[in-house]
């Protein structure tokens, strides 16, 4: 929108504004690189291929962002007011209540993207909205029954036990925002209960590390149970999970590949389409004692989906790698 000339305000929660400052510049850079690659290899139907937006557009967009607090009712246009409520999905996510005056009187529209799971860690339950004249709601899993959370957690713990007993590494491809922080919290719970055998846990994603720091700055938004649990460790994630190490630079990431067993490695991208996880897969997929835990949605055509579907071989960084690890 900004690239096309939008100059109005962009209302969001303060946590969303901070996450945008992490995610959008990287996205703009990727847009530019993909357009340059398409032009160099002449495979785009556009002449020339152009990025949807650039890093410069991102900076202009960030300058338009105006953070507002949950529950704060504010005017957005003549006769139109809005209010953000916690959607409980990721830190800063919001349900939008919108009131507008029209020829048929005042109407209320409620809009939301993803809503959080009632039993998810860290985030509170989604806010309950009492009424609406019009509701627009994301519904990806609207027609599905999921197994209980406890079954999932039990399976997660069992896989970690098997990997530790077998001497292999555990690779967890994870999205930088939301899922990585949930995994660290669950690992912390296991550690505090004396159930985590691994002595090395790596969060090998600069973006996930930055997102985790946003979570820490906004931990007042966590649910009461998570606040109480983390509070017993002084609110410090690395005190809650002492084996945790943040790997910020390339050299530290490369050093992990010398570890052949006993480590849990969390890295992006979540669908294994890029990022540091591809290097870790290259060094571990062919090991029969290694485990890969898929913790998020995997789109068709992605390496992550290929693993879920039982691929016996995967091409990573230009090399065919046999899949002998347990997925």
Question: Whereabouts are the PLM-identified features?
Answer:
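Solvent-exposed alpha-helices and their adjacent loops that cap or buttress functional pockets
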Residues: 102-104, 126-129, 194, 256-259, ...
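His/Asp/Glu-rich metal-coordinating catalytic cores
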Residues: 1-182, 188-195, 200
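Flexible, active-site-adjacent loop/turn segments at secondary-structure boundaries
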Residues: 28, 72-74, 88, 127, ...
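Basic, gly/Ser/Thr/Pro-rich low-complexity segments located predominantly at protein N termini
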Residues: 93, 97, 118, 147, ...
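Short, conserved active-site loop motifs that form the nucleotide-linked donor/cofactor pocket
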Residues: 65, 80, 244-245, 263, ...
